[in-house]
Structure formats: C-alpha cells, structure tokens
C-alpha cells in the first residue's frame, strides 16, 4: 500500500519495483497493490485509465479470492493520516480472514530513526560530499509530522553533517529551512545544496 504518485516513470522505478521484489520473494502468494490517496487514484484513472485499488478494494479482492492470511505492507514513511486510515480499513476486515497483520510505517519506533539515518547517510554521503543536504518529506497535519524533526536530529547525530528536513504539506517548509541555512553559523547564501526527496521518488540535485 502506497500513497501513490501521478508520475508513471516514478511509479515504475519505485512503487512497482517494491511490488516486484515482494512477488519475487513470495511467488506463491496473492499480491495486491493499493493506493491510499483518493486524489492519486482519481488522477490515475483520468489521465492513464488505470483503476488503482484502494486498500479496502484490495482487501475485498483478496477475500473473494479465498485468501485466509493477509500481511499489509505500507510504504508510508510516517504513521500519519494515510497510515491510520489504512489500519482502520484493516480492522474492519479482521473477521474476514483467519489472520490479518499490518506492518509499521518506516518511522514507528525510536530504533527506526537510527536505522534509517544510517541507511540514508551511507547511501548518500558520496553524492553529498561537503554540500548541505535537504531532504523533502511529504508532511501532514497529523501529530506524526513531528517525526520529520526527530529524523533530522537522528541524521545530524549519525552523519555529523549539515542536514535539514523540510516538508511539502507539513509544519516545516522549504522556506523555513532556507531561513535556517541563511541565519545559521554555516551561512550558505551562495553555493550548492543537495536536495533529495524523503519519499518514494527519484534523487536529484539543485543549486540554491
């Protein structure tokens, strides 16, 4: 289950790639894809004529196929609105299967922050070099938006580097981060930064 994206190339390189890996690991299992965002599902239908399933529709499909044990694997980064809706949908189907379990979002426990910080930095440090790093998360009005600030702290603690996390729809915006960079002891009014999404998207760089 993913939030989804309206960009076909990104969907194939990221979300679909995860689905392919799951199918390869469990070749005998019924694997359904679901998109939690209604807006994204509607856009996929209108632009690409793709009928993406909602989590409820995917569970209903599994029920009709006679599946008895279900593992729900969200690709959500934080335990925000979309992930809570997913868990509520799964609860409603508790009696439809012998067993149904929902995996945690990426950042659910304190140890997750340390593990993700290590994995992210080790994969990005050569590309980052001496440049400041900005990670862009989706963000949410949910209290789980605080997870991004906690993730920034964990990244800074592990990497010992100038790292920021901003969000598209959360409380910490890119403008907030730019203001921090300009007013901080390591002022970066000119020069480059590495800007990369903290979501299922592609890596890219940008001048700032």
Language model features with spans:
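Short, structured motif recognition centered on aromatic/hydrophobic residues
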Residues: 1-3, 70-75, 132-136, 193-201
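Solvent-exposed loop/turn segments at secondary-structure junctions
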Residues: 4-7, 38-41, 77-80, 107-110, ...
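An N-terminus-focused feature that recognizes amino-terminal "leader" regions
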Residues: 8-28, 40-45
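Redox- and metal-dependent alpha/beta enzyme cores, enriched for Fe-S-associated oxidoreductases
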Residues: 18, 138-177
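Short connector loops at secondary-structure junctions
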Residues: 30-46, 108, 164-176
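Glycine-rich, highly charged phosphate/nucleotide-binding loops
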Residues: 47-61
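A substrate-binding/cap region within the structured catalytic cores of diverse enzymes
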Residues: 81-146, 151
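Conserved small/polar residues in nucleotide/adenosyl-binding loops
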Residues: 204-208
């Amino acid at each position: 289950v993913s939030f989804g994206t309206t960009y076909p190339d990104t969907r194939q390189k990221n979300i679909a790639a995860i689905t392919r890996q799951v199918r390869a690991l469990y070749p005998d299992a019924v694997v359904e894809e679901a998109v939690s965002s209604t807006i994204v599902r509607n856009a996929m239908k209108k632009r690409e004529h793709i009928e993406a399933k909602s989590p409820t529709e995917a569970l209903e499909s599994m029920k009709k196929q006679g599946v008895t044990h279900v593992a729900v694997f969200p690709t959500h980064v934080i335990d925000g609105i979309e992930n809570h809706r997913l868990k509520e949908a799964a609860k409603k189907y508790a009696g439809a299967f012998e067993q149904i379990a929902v995996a945690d979002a990426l950042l659910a426990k304190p140890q997750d922050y340390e593990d993700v910080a290590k994995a992210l930095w080790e994969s990005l440090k050569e590309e980052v070099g001496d440049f400041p790093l900005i990670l862009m998360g989706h963000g949410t009005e949910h209290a789980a938006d605080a997870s991004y600030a906690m993730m920034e702290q964990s990244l800074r603690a592990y990497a010992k580097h100038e790292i920021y996390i901003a969000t598209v729809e959360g409380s910490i915006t890119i403008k907030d981060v730019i203001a921090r960079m300009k007013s901080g002891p390591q002022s970066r009014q000119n020069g480059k930064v590495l800007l990369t999404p903290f979501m299922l998207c592609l890596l890219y760089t940008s001048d700032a």
